[in-house]
C-alpha cells in the first residue's frame, strides 16, 4: 500500500479529490496540519463523493508528529518529496510498497528546511517553464524585462513547489500543476512500477 502525504493542504476540493484517488487505489491519506479547512467542510466531502467514508485517513499535529507516528526519519528512504526544486524526476525514482509520496501546500509547497534535510529524496514532475507553456509567453517575457528581471531572477521566481495552484494576477504564468493531478501522476507511476497490486 502506498501513502499520500499532504503537508498543510489549503484547498478542500483538492484534498477531497485526492481522497477519492486513495480509495480507488488502496492508498492511505496522511494530512499534516495545519489544514486550511475543516475535514467536515462540504467541499471536501463533495469532491470525495460517496468514497469519503471508505477513506483510510490520518491527521497529524505537524511534520515531527507524522515522522514519529510512522517510524520515519527526515531523510528516510521511503519518503518521496515532490517539488519543482528537484533535479531528479519522479520517473527516475524507484517506488516500493509502503512508500510515502509527500506533497506540499498549494501556495508554497514543502517548506525549504524539509527539502534541505533530504535533498536526495526530492523529485519533480517535468513540465515546461511557466512562460513557455502559455500562449502569451512573449508577453510574460516582456513583462519580466520591464520589471528588470534577468534570466536568473526569473528562475528564482519559478522556484515554487510542484503542488502550487495559486496564480498571482500580476504574473502572466501558470505556477504549477494542480495538487490532485500531481498526486495522481506520481501515485500511478508508483503503482505501475509495483505491478498494480490487487487491481
Predicted features by range, described:
Residues 1-199:
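Post-transcriptional modification and biogenesis factors for structured RNAs
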Amino acid at each position: 500500500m502506498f501513502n499520500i502525504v499532504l503537508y498543510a493542504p489549503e484547498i478542500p476540493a483538492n484534498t477531497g479529490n485526492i481522497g477519492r484517488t486513495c480509495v480507488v487505489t488502496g492508498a492511505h491519506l496522511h494530512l499534516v496540519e495545519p489544514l486550511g479547512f475543516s475535514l467536515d467542510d462540504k467541499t471536501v466531502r463533495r469532491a470525495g463523493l460517496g468514497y469519503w467514508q471508505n477513506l483510510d485517513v490520518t491527521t497529524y499535529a505537524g511534520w515531527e508528529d507524522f515522522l514519529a507516528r510512522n517510524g520515519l526519519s527526515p531523510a528516510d528512504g521511503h519518503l518521496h518529496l515532490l517539488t519543482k526544486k528537484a533535479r531528479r524526476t519522479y520517473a527516475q525514482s524507484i517506488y516500493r510498497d509502503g512508500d510515502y509520496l509527500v506533497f506540499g501546500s498549494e501556495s508554497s509547497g514543502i517548506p525549504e528546511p524539509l527539502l534541505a534535510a533530504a535533498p536526495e529524496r526530492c523529485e519533480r514532475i517535468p513540465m515546461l517553464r511557466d512562460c513557455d507553456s502559455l500562449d502569451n509567453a512573449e508577453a510574460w517575457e516582456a513583462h519580466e524585462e520591464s520589471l528588470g528581471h534577468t534570466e536568473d531572477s526569473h528562475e528564482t521566481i519559478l522556484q515554487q513547489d510542484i503542488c502550487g495552484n495559486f496564480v498571482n494576477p500580476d504574473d502572466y504564468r501558470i505556477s504549477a500543476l494542480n495538487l490532485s493531478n500531481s498526486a495522481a501522476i506520481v501515485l500511478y507511476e508508483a503503482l505501475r512500477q509495483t505491478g498494480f497490486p490487487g487491481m
